[in-house]
Amino acid sequence: MKTLDKEEFRIKLEEINKLVQKKDYKGAMGIVDSIDWRRVKNVRTLCVVGEIYAANKRYEDSKEIFLLAYHRAPIGKNILYRLIEVSLRMKDIQEAEEFYEEFLEIAPNDSTRYILNYKISKEKQVPLDQQIRILEEYKEKEFTERWSYELAKLYYQNGDTEKCLDLCNEMVLWFSEGKYVMKALDLKNRMGMLTGAEKEKYDKQFIPNLTTVEEAAELNTDKDSQEISEIEKA
């Protein structure tokens, strides 16, 4: 691993960023491995590298880079969040809990602490009642689609269909559309509690988006007009 001058490093960094934008994390990792990141001080760059390693399931390398970033960041709560997630991916619950304690010291009032606590508790396989209480506390602070659905799913798994149904209805009312609303409708469907309009919306996702005869004719007309225009220009 040779030492790069500033220009070589800049070029490689541009290549990495382009590959990340294309979500080609495997290709980006090929470049990342050729650089000694211990010499890099830019926290944002280090975080990108940490994410690349995590995307390639190289969690030990990801953790090492995130630790470098954490020690160079003035306030590192977001980096601690990722360190906790990476530690959990590595099944290192003890280390995740140590990072979580650091997170609480830095950001004791940040509502994200509930999500981190939930992720750790889930990995530890604590009883569902405890997991539910954590997400209920979070819901009192923040009402978000993803974690509301997660809570509804826990209610369902715990056999509390009434609370599951109430929360699913609340999600549909507040958010109306989106991935997690469809997941909430799926839970309602399993319980046989979809309304007529909800069933129509739920079933629609399984129907291919086919082009009608009229739309196809219109597309062909537009294409013919474009070809004629190009011929006239020539």
Where are the model-predicted features located?
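Short solvent-exposed coil/turn linkers within tandem alpha-helical repeat scaffolds
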Residues: 37-40, 73, 141, 174-181
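Ankyrin-repeat and related helical/solenoid repeat scaffolds used for protein-protein interactions
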Residues: 123-171
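TPR-repeat structural position
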Residues: 25, 59, 93, 127-128, ...
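TPR-adjacent "capping" and linker segments in tetratricopeptide-repeat scaffold/adaptor proteins
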Residues: 1-10, 34-41, 136-140
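Alpha-helical adaptor scaffolds
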Residues: 47-54, 67-68, 75-143
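Register position in tetratricopeptide repeats
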Residues: 21, 55, 89, 123-124, ...
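Intrinsically disordered, low-complexity, charge-biased linker/tail regions
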Residues: 1-30, 75-85, 98-120, 177-234
